[in-house]
Curated annotation (Swiss-Prot):
The keyword Isomerase does not apply. Keywords: Signal, Transport. Residues 1-27 form the signal peptide. Pfam families: PBP_like_2. GO terms for molecular function: phosphate ion binding. It comes from Synechocystis sp. (strain ATCC 27184 / PCC 6803 / Kazusa). This is Protein SphX. The lineage of its organism: Bacteria, Bacillati, Cyanobacteriota, Cyanophyceae, Synechococcales. May be involved in the system for phosphate transport across the cytoplasmic membrane. Belongs to the PstS family. PROSITE patterns: PROKAR_LIPOPROTEIN.
């Protein structure tokens, strides 16, 4: 018997889901898979798609990125099979999915450390406090805090040039909430892009730059970028696998997800096979592309959730700040 309390959390067993699947949009073909969403998650998914496609003929997989918000919109309209996400689904997106009878399985696949970066030729900036980051990025700083010596007097009297993910980005949502205190609250006089490679190029070419994006994009260009330590009151901490696993890199550590359309997974054997392959290879692939893999227990819980058809989210549409890997495991187990 299924637990009625799960309905309040948006979690429904697949057996109940199947009673109402006929109204959902079918997959493009039985052998096609459409993926869209986070540019942060994209390198993991792209690598897994390449590995899966290398040994699987006749499956057409289209993987793109438009930001977490843009990806959820497409997903909840039934236009894609999988949404890559760098934050949990929010209440507005949950409503859109519900309105379109899109049920989903939420699968954590890695941890990220949002990395604050500058140009490596910048020899005076080594760390910033959370309060300094807030002063730099908050809306009130627009056209008022524009030079580095306004952050600290010992910094040079030179312009601050800011590089930020776009407003559809889950990284933008998470950073602004964690640092400024409200998701989406940010000054507008910045260079924004949903493409993290454009942000990387901007920082690389600009001595007085400051930007942020997912850890893998820093790791991939580590010789061309300088990570800035984040001081949350206990001294500066640099992003790394070790500082994330020890819950030291706060508040900019966060989980990464894929969301799978449960109805399409029922109808499309190739999609089911791909998700199984994804979970089996997520740890090694996350490490390879530069993210922090989850403990094996997390992937096992994901396999259970997917195979049992546990649909919904354990986050209730709420933002999650300062989540540790251990706390994520506890949330995953709450599906049981």
């Amino acid at each position: 018997m299924f637990d009625l309390s799960r309905l309040s959390r948006g979690i429904v067993p697949m057996a109940l889901l199947l009673l109402g699947i006929s109204a959902c949009t079918p997959s493009q073909t039985s052998q096609s898979i459409a993926i869209n969403g986070s540019s942060t998650v994209y390198p993991i998914t792209e690598a897994i798609v390449a590995d899966f496609s290398g040994g699987k003929k006749g499956v057409d997989i289209d993987v793109e990125f438009s930001g977490t918000g843009g990806g959820f919109k497409l997903f909840c309209e039934g236009k894609t099979d999988i949404a890559d996400a760098s934050r949990p689904i929010n209440k507005q997106e949950m409503k859109l999915c519900n309105d379109n009878q899109v049920r989903y399985v939420e699968l954590p696949i890695a941890f990220d450390a949002i990395t604050v970066v500058s140009n490596p030729k910048n020899d005076w900036l080594k760390s910033l406090t959370v309060e300094e980051l807030k002063r730099i990025w908050e809306p009130a700083a627009e056209k008022t805090l524009t030079r580095w010596n306004q952050v600290r007097p010992e910094f040079p009297d030179q312009p601050i040039n800011l590089y930020s993910p776009g407003e559809d980005s889950g990284t933008f949502d998470y950073f602004t909430e964690a640092i400024v205190g409200q998701a989406g609250a940010s000054r507008l006089d910045t260079l924004k892009s949903e493409d993290d490679e454009i942000l990387v190029q901007g920082v690389v070419q600009d001595l007085y730059s400051l930007g942020y994006f997912g850890f893998a994009y820093y790791e991939g260009r580590i010789a061309d970028l300088k990570a800035i330590g984040v001081d949350n009151g206990r001294g500066p901490v640099l992003p790394s696998r070790e500082t994330v696993e020890k819950s030291e890199y706060q508040p900019l550590s966060r989980p990464l997800f894929i969301y799978v359309n449960a109805t399409k997974a029922q109808d499309n054997p190739a999609l089911r096979e791909f998700v199984d392959f994804y979970l089996a290879n997520a740890s090694a692939t996350a490490t390879k592309v530069g993210y922090i893999p989850l403990p094996e227990e997390a992937y096992n819980l994901g396999k259970i959730s997917f195979n049992k058809g546990e649909v919904g989210t354990v986050f209730g549409g709420e933002s999650v700040m300062d989540l540790t890997i251990g706390e994520l495991l506890k949330k995953q187990a709450s599906f049981e």
